[in-house]
Amino acid sequence: MNNLSPLEVAIADFQAAKTTPELIRATKNLCDLRTIEAIPILIEGLGFNNPAVASVATSGLIELGSQAVPSLLVSLDEKNYGSRAWVVRALASIRDPRSLDLLEHALATDIAPSVRRSAARGLAELNLIYPEDRSKLERCLLALLAAIKDDEWVVRYAVIFGIELHLRRYNPNNKNHCILALKQLSSDSESIKVIRLRAKLALQRLASS
């Protein structure tokens, strides 16, 4: 292997790894190279049904930032929940506007609560500029508003965070609709106490800002 490049060595180690510790070590070595050429292998690691390996690979992809987005966008495996969850988490953390379509779709339709929660966080924090990106910001907010009745409280919690963030940072046309949504989530019609409290906190912060 003396004639191999560091990337080739790291890929060979990754492909030869048999145990979780070996896979983690090989994945970390790939991440440490900080090269876009490692992206396909890191994405492969997201689908191993091994959370420890996927977590390391996701961190490496996030560190590569927008360079990883095109490959992540085309790698979504609708049949592999684990891989899908990590891909959406990575895209949400990178915050690249090119992820908007995928995050919208994931929040609205994905069967996995963790995927919907990550999508909500991603829509809250995409790197968009107001007012230049007003139309995209409105899409993000509309997607969040549509998810306020999500069956899973962890998703509703992320939605509250997103709505509050949008109202504090921008001046959306449907601000009153957002306030009404938060009031609904803070009322007794919401069965989960932590959701009521989080919505009340959002309203208090918005009132004082």
From Swiss-Prot:
Pfam families: HEAT_2 (PF13646). Keywords: Antenna complex, Lyase, Phycobilisome. Gene3D superfamilies: Leucine-rich Repeat Variant (1.25.10.10). The keyword Lyase applies. Disulfide bonds: none annotated. Transmembrane segments: none annotated. The keyword Lyase applies. InterPro entries: ARM-like, ARM-type_fold, PBS_lyase_HEAT. GO terms for cellular component: phycobilisome. One of its GO terms (molecular function) is lyase activity. PANTHER family: PBS LYASE HEAT DOMAIN PROTEIN REPEAT-CONTAINING PROTEIN, PBS LYASE HEAT-LIKE PROTEIN. An enzyme involved in the biosynthesis of bilin. Might be involved in the specific attachment of phycoerythrobilin (PEB) to the R-phycocyanin II alpha chain. Belongs to the CpcE/RpcE/PecE family. This is Bilin biosynthesis protein RpcF. It comes from Synechococcus sp. (strain WH8020). The gene is rpcF.
